[in-house]
């Protein structure tokens, strides 16, 4: 592991905007912020928007700057990647931006039913290998999971046209699966 990666992991632990639940918390599905993100983390009741697979978090930060009336949470498993967005959000004093470091498989352990208003899947790994198609962030099992914490009428916004075309007709539990973008 490179020394920059170790330094970034250590620095992430000092950023208020980085949330890193332990494996036991998410595995048991009782994460402390579940159902309490607005009250306990953001301190407001604004709509929550997730960016899944946020990578370096630049898009999450840009959304937070453009829409200060919403709360944004970038989600990625790679802490060294999240560092860039977390550092920018911290330096800019952004109170409406957070980063959640967890595996997508455990994300429903972190959010209560109806807690999330919108989900952005902007630049996901396409998982081109036939054996890994089920790992796509837009695979049916993930869409079903997102529906559990997406509010009624909430939207999933793919950030690229090929996936948008594929998702256009999907309805899941009364949720609008795709916004017109």
Per-range role (PLM):
Residues 78:
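Conserved SAM/SAH-binding beta-strand->alpha-helix loop
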């Amino acid at each position: 592991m490179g020394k920059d990666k170790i330094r970034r992991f250590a620095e992430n632990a000092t950023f208020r905007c980085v949330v890193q639940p332990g494996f036991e918390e998410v595995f048991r599905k009782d994460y402390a912020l579940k159902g309490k993100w607005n009250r306990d983390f953001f301190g407001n009741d604004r709509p929550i928007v997730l960016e899944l697979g946020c990578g370096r978090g630049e898009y999450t930060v840009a959304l937070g700057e453009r829409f200060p009336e919403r709360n944004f949470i970038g989600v990625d498993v790679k802490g060294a990647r999240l560092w860039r967005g977390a550092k920018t959000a911290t330096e800019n004093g952004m109170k409406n931006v957070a980063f959640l470091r967890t595996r997508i498989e455990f994300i429903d352990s972190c959010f209560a039913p109806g807690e999330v208003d919108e989900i952005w899947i902007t630049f996901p790994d396409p998982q081109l290998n036939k054996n890994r198609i089920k790992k796509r962030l837009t695979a049916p099992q993930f869409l079903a999971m997102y529906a559990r914490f997406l509010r009624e009428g909430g939207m999933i916004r793919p950030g690229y046209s090929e996936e948008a075309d594929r998702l256009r007709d999907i309805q899941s539990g009364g949720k609008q699966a795709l916004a017109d973008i």
